[in-house]
Amino acid sequence: METKNNELQTVAEAIGPIEFTGLRLTAPPQYAAGVPAVKIALEHAMREMGLAKSIATLSKLNQKEGIDCPGCAWPDPDHRSNLGEFCENGVKAIAEEATNKRVTPTFFEKYSVKEMSQWSDFKIGKSGRVTHPMILREGDTHYTPIAWEEAFEIIGQHLQLLDNPNQAIFYTSGRSSNEAAFLYGLFARKLGTNNMPDCSNMCHESSGAGLFQTLGIGKGSVTLEDFQYADVVMVMGQNPGTNHPRMLNALEKCRQKGGKVVSVNPLKEAALVRFKNPQEVKGVVGNGAAISDFYLQIKINQDVALLKYIMKRLIEIEQEEGNVIDWDFIRENTNGTENLFKDLSQYTKAELIEKTGLKVGEVEPIVTLLAQKKKVIICWAMGLTQHKNGVDNIRECVNLLLLKGSIGVQGGGTCPVRGHSNVQGDRTVGITHHVSPKLNAAFERTFHFKPPTLEGLDVVHCIKAMYEGKAKVFMALGGNFLSAASDTNYTAKALQNCDLTVSVSTKLNRTHLVTGKTALILPTLGRTEKDASDGKSRFVTVENSMGRVHRSVGRIAPASEHLMSEPEIVSRIAKSYFKEDFSIPWNRLGTDYDFTRSKISEVFDGFKDYTERSKKSGFDLPNHTRRGDFSKLPGGVAKFSINQLPDHDLKEGEFLMMTIRSHDQYNTTIYGLDDRYRGIFNERRVVLINPKDIEDLRLKANEIVDLKSDYNGVERKAENFIIVPYEIPQGNLASYFPEANVLIPNDQFATISNTPISKSVRVSIVKK
């Protein structure tokens, strides 16, 4: 194997191949799940894991004392199904992690970094589990094996050579456990930096910011049980059939109890039309259950306009008939109502409706419904958060709920539906670039050092710092940072500017191939795998989307004897850096998870008797908003807010594009090449467009085009996309990420939250 020549690792491709894989189109189905979902899920499991391992993992998936799914953060019901408490994409996530495929030192000897970078993200991910710690030394073309101790020593040396701790960046993926994330945050603070960007910066940061400003807590207020008591559930900017399939059970139960479901989405998603529950007879041999009573195919990012229209109409009906707005709740628990009414008065209903692209007749039934009902849940995901005005979108949802008095009541409240399985837990246990004097004091009290007080860097700003040479070491606790971030080429250059990049990973991904001068892959245990120390079994804990903390216990043998758990990896790095400083017992923290949890309980409220309470069903963390308590806010009341209509400043010929996932995808992990629920098969390089727009542009279905964005005079291009006619509002486009991420500038992000504008990118279509 040739390891050193003129072919440096910097020639690695940031973007995969732009060839096509053979598009096949069908009419989108009118339902989700059912027998096809079971069949496809089991085929995937058998192909990746085989029979024995499939039984061992799936029988324990999301069960009490079992494996927490590494996919989404949707909560588990108190009473688990004996037929299996998982969904199609949960099975895919487990199969992806527990695959029998292996990426060994021989694999790395065979393939250079350059060659692997020319593969698709799908092919890279399907290579398998990394079995040994690997290093790409400066100037080398191939990764080579490295002993764990040497890897830790290299990281420690690079950190010691920094001019100051803020030249280091510690990124966290939502797959990491509470225990690992806590130690990671402790290490960064002890080192002296708050540079702790995490994946939530790119997704639900807008949710946390909007909710914290208005309600005093950055988490949702509802529980899973609330769905059975809700009069109305609004699902906005979210596609549960692909991203949170078990949520469909909750929506079905809501309707069975007499509740109504209102879906608001630019695309008609099959799962929001009809759901065939494969655990019920009618889901196997019948027609299943309708999910949405009303479906509004709104224009991209016009949710504020819709909500303002609804609130204007509710105020009108209140003035005419009364008993629509909860004045008792408003007087006792809020302020800012007068300013809200004044803001709404400056808009006409006609202009608001025009912005949405909807018709009055489509929206008025929802107005009537909300006027008559009190208990309202609003659910949302990236369709609301990934915009310049993402925080405004969330605050406007809160405005509607406050008008109805539907926060802190059974069957009503906020429901940001989180993506990665422990993204909320990581934040709870201290992964944040923000500075909290209270949190710093707790760390100082527990570990006897003064944490840094300088605000850290979030994702977009850490990329900028690396690009400008102001950050030298980048470490990722899980994730595929390059493919997840916006502005792919810019992000790639940023990573390549680093002296050292470190990835704690289970599987190969593109971030391992576009690296700093030196790069390390540190292979770790997955959720499915047994975690033991000195013969004693250990478990980790996670927090779901609704604030419940519970344990996850691995059940199968590790993919390799050379793997190390995340807490141990973090503690060993810390020990390597701090050497003779024994003020923090890193060894014990990395190996004794009970001890680590005891320290978490000393730093954070709500974790008393952590280890014992996390067993069985787990425990709920304190949530004052859930109780209708807003005392954490100034004045002790919730806040109405004033939010402007978005201005996308589209020029002639420009469209507003949103990046989306396919059904064979979770975050940056590509399970396959199909998007079954949209009738798109064996292809990812597609752009969904309204047939009228195709006609106006004199294009044809299946024609190949390029997509181009232009921000501040800088053009970015994504090449080779196939035109697919689709039911989407005129002027709007949709395309998959990470393929379309190259079009999103790193400096275009949400006000306050700094979340990239991945759901509202100005683009134009360029004919070939």
Where are these regions (language model features)?
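Intrinsically disordered, low-structural-confidence terminal and linker regions
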Residues: 1-66
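Cofactor-/ligand-binding subdomain signature composed of acidic, glycine-rich
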Residues: 43-50, 58-166, 266-373
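Acidic/polar N-terminal loop/beta-strand segments that form early-domain functional surfaces
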Residues: 133, 171-173, 658-660
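Long, structured ligand/cofactor-binding scaffold of large enzymes
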Residues: 143-146, 150-229
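Short boundary motifs at domain starts and secondary-structure transition points
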Residues: 159-162, 367-368, 465-466, 645-649
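Non-catalytic alpha/beta scaffold blocks inside enzyme catalytic domains
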Residues: 206-399, 403-409, 416-599, 653-656, ...
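Long, low-complexity segments enriched in small/aliphatic residues
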Residues: 588-677
